[in-house]
């Protein structure tokens, strides 16, 4: 009981002090919110507008060719495939360049899952 009472006292003090500071946090949050709308240079709306202006400027400087090339390169990524001893199905095929195929293993009757294994033959 002697060791429990200091911890209980500490818990009560933490709860009382924690609730007292909750109002201060609300006030600080409201002040920050008001400051953001007072100073338009710091507001998120101003950042979005600036971003749009920069995109227009970039497009005029580099043209649409640059944006189309980056989109094409982004979409031409090699499709991912599963490695050895990893679960596979129609949506997640095994890697053909690693010479793996999706087969029913010995535990298929229990797990009802296929796994990537080396091609036999």
Curated annotation (Swiss-Prot):
Tissues and organs where the protein is expressed, per its UniProt entry: Expressed by the venom gland.
Domain of life of the native organism: Eukaryota
A Pfam family the protein falls into: Toxin_22
Disulphide bridges, residue numbers: 81-95, 88-102, 94-116
Molecular function via GO: sodium channel inhibitor activity; toxin activity
Subcellular location: Secreted
Record propeptide residues: 21-80
Keywords: Amidation, Cleavage on pair of basic residues, Disulfide bond, Ion channel impairing toxin, Knottin, Neurotoxin, Secreted, Signal, Toxin, Voltage-gated sodium channel impairing toxin
Family according to the record: Belongs to the neurotoxin 14 (magi-1) family. 09 (magi-1) subfamily.
Domain description: The presence of a 'disulfide through disulfide knot' structurally defines this protein as a knottin.
Primary role: Insecticidal neurotoxin. Shows competition for site 3 of insect voltage-gated sodium channels (Nav). Induces flaccid paralysis when injected into lepidopteran larvae. Is not toxic to mice when injected intracranially at 20 pmol/g.
Protein name from the UniProt record: Mu-hexatoxin-Mg1a
Species, as recorded: Macrothele gigas (Japanese funnel web spider)
Species lineage: Eukaryota, Metazoa, Ecdysozoa, Arthropoda, Chelicerata
């Amino acid at each position: 009981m002697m060791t429990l009472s200091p911890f209980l006292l500490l818990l009560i003090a933490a709860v009382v002090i924690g609730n007292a500071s909750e109002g201060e946090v609300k006030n600080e949050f409201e002040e920050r919110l008001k400051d953001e709308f007072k100073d338009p240079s710091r507001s998120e709306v101003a950042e979005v507008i600036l971003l749009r202006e920069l995109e227009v400027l970039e497009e005029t400087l580099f043209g649409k060719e640059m944006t189309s090339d980056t989109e094409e390169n982004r979409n031409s990524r090699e499709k991912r495939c599963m490695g050895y001893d990893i679960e596979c199905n129609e949506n997640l095929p095994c890697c053909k360049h690693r010479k793996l195929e999706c087969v029913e293993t010995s535990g298929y009757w229990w797990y009802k899952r296929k796994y990537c294994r080396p091609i036999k033959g």
